[in-house]
Regions:
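A short glycine/serine-rich beta->alpha loop
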Residues: 63-70, 103-107
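A short mixed-secondary-structure module that forms the rim of ligand-binding clefts
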Residues: 67-86
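Short, surface-exposed loop/turn motifs that are enriched in glycine and acidic residues
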Residues: 18-22, 66-71
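C-terminal binding/interaction regions
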Residues: 3-38, 82, 88-163
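Short beta-strand scaffold segments in enzyme catalytic cores
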Residues: 47-54
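Short loop/turn motifs at secondary-structure junctions and domain boundaries
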Residues: 41-44
């Protein structure tokens, strides 16, 4: 008879204020904040902006786009990633910043991506064999994660289908 083992998953992440960020990371968050203006969120009134920095330093933005048939919309993160992959498929993503704004303004707590976006973000790490730093903005501060895997600990990637 085997004995069940109790296992634990922990992640390390940083929490900082905007004035503690590098100029490059601050600019990425500011680009994501500017992208919120391109959001079409007539139904939820929840506007999300994303900005990603490619390996060559180029920044690509995305904003959520809602549709009356809710599954037909697209989140800001995937909007930015798919735009980057369509225009610059040879460029890995080094970092991704996400911000959100409701009817009261930017959220106090850092915004986190939905499960579908986490999976697409993870695919970029797997595709280019490098981590994507994730910056999650709130007016109270910024969470910084070293890898998308920190958001998706039981990750499903191509390798899982080959074992």
């Amino acid at each position: 008879k085997s004995i069940m083992k109790k296992l634990k998953i922990e992640i390390d992440y940083d929490f900082c204020q905007l004035d503690e960020l590098s100029e490059q990371d601050l600019n990425l968050i500011e680009s994501a904040k500017a992208a919120v203006k391109n959001s079409y969120a007539n139904y939820s009134h929840f506007h999300v902006g994303a900005a990603l920095r490619l390996h060559d330093g180029r920044v690509v933005i995305g904003a959520n786009q809602e549709n009356a048939a809710f599954p037909s919309g697209l989140c800001a993160e995937r909007s930015a990633i798919f735009a980057a992959q369509s225009h610059y498929p040879e460029q890995a993503i080094d970092a991704l910043a996400i911000v959100a704004h409701n009817e009261k303004g930017f959220l106090s707590d850092p915004i986190t991506p939905c499960g579908a976006c986490r999976q697409v973000m993870l695919e970029m790490e797997d595709r280019y064999k490098q981590n994507v730093r994730v910056l999650l903005y709130g007016t109270s501060g910024v969470y910084i994660l070293k890898s998308v895997k920190d958001l998706l600990p039981f990750a499903f990637v191509d390798e899982n289908m080959r074992k």
